[in-house]
């Protein structure tokens, strides 16, 4: 019998969007009993509302985000149905919803309402823009949130339209699951529930983490504009860096300019390592970088992509070829690590699907049931959970309260634009919901440190263990996109906040023995360096779990716990997923999702896996091995298009698509007089009439080419062209005023300068201030992406000096005497 890590948890889910449903599915994958409530009075969500899913195939999105759930269909207009929902919620550990705040309050489904009957309920809410602030009631659409974060204008080549990648919503989905488990962990101690909020706004901010961190520190507007692919700050790495090969493919390089990479790379490319044009870091990443990139451009163009991939592999370089989705679908690493599955659907036959991004050694995620039909388990749920009799169930069915068919048209008034009561800001006064969890964080650069940061933000005692003398290589970051870092190194300090710092030489016998002693008193061991080094250093899972069977042993590998262990950085791995080659206008170079975007998502996935393992340990007393890889995580960043490709193998989902050819012109990006805007409207007769009224372009409504939904689909390119002309006539501010008057959903596409002063971001602690010793005062930085109402996270300090806490931590936390500490110094174990 398979052990289910979350088998003791019941989740009642009432959602309308795919990203929030996916948050619940992640809990179901690890064994939670997820009961999806389908409101029969609402029509089904149109999977092609944005025009990105052409006719044909089946609803692959739903097969992914609704798996491992049971479904009950209730007509929630009926008081009897609402009573059934109330009864279900009284038995639930978690209620997960994405309904608008105003509707939640109007229906009597607020946290206060539910907690009166079930004080321990964890109330999880997926919102658009957070629980507080002036814009908390804006529609929860990922495009609107992405437009506001500042990242969209930075992604393409100069002169190209802002790029919407669709990845922010995947951050939010995982944040919902992570926040749920943090609150459940705290509930196990206090017995009390609370509200968890994860918003699309916060998800998209974390998707642009490194660039946003850099802008908040440097306030340099050059970070808000696109960078040409041959103007990268490092010829061996850069957000837009791409070199074409002889067969029309693209090379990506992701190697910091250090002694670890430069000699090997220069030798492979036939560059003289001692050439005075680039014999120092400052020359290679400064005055000599453009000349070197021109030489590399010419040399890469002489050979095929396959040739270069083989050379990179031989030299063990973090470099590869940017692939399409076809590669990901057949990639052995994705299959052997269960990131992509081969499934058999009872109606559609054989197909591929995304699998499970986090590996758990003892309690792996499983596909226990396919996505259910609407209301498929209604009778089962009522009997098993509520003890209803057959006669009672039959009565509900005959009254239309319980069923399996959704309404075809909306029959309830929309509350999406209504206003709701803003909750008071929670103030953290205790030790945090993860107090008592001790993490030994032996990670470097970004992915692993992000994981440790998320745990530390919520109160875990995270001890960052670095090598003496130099420490984490991220301490040496000098520039972002060829722009010198500010007076403080935000790259390192932000993701290592709230941690203690220790310096231990793990190459010495005494250092390894010391770490083994610390493992005895640790809950989590976290590692993202070379997997080969674990056994060499005596830090492998078998060794450490023998020392402490309760230890959660967490790694952040590059390509998974099985198969390849070659060097991996964010962009190199992202290149293999296919997401980069489908973004942007046709013919443009592949587009990287943004500095650190994949790393940060991998760190979030790792934190989720650790929380699952800690929950299971509470029940069993045993830890286990957890791995969250860059490959597994980044495949999930591509869910909105990759899942559809895997199910259909339709190249449409792997191709670049021009905004000029948007299949729904009302869900598209347009340039206004002073900047770009994102309009997000389903193409219905009502919405088209509202849009025409807002723009004053009534002539469009009378144009026979656009007289119906079907006609507009046929003439979609002509309509985009007309709207381009119309939108250019006014400023974004003028358009937003007119759109608000006519109910048109839209947002200006902003830059990082706007993001830095965004009132909504500050109101929800998505941006924070804290003292920074390196800067000599307070600094502003990316804050807390998940809000807990009763035990919120907090930031007390940014990253510390190397080894600052070594001696005190050994004495106070691990019980090492001062005499022993002196001896460790003599042996070179600590500085």
What are these language model-derived features?
Residues 1-10, 229-230, 244-246, 291, ...:
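Terminal low-complexity tails and localization/encapsulation signals of metabolic enzymes
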Residues 165, 183-230, 308, 325-327, ...:
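Substrate-binding/catalytic subdomain of NAD(P)-dependent oxidoreductase enzymes
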Residues 34, 313-327, 388-393, 462-465, ...:
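Short, well-structured beta-strand/strand-turn elements
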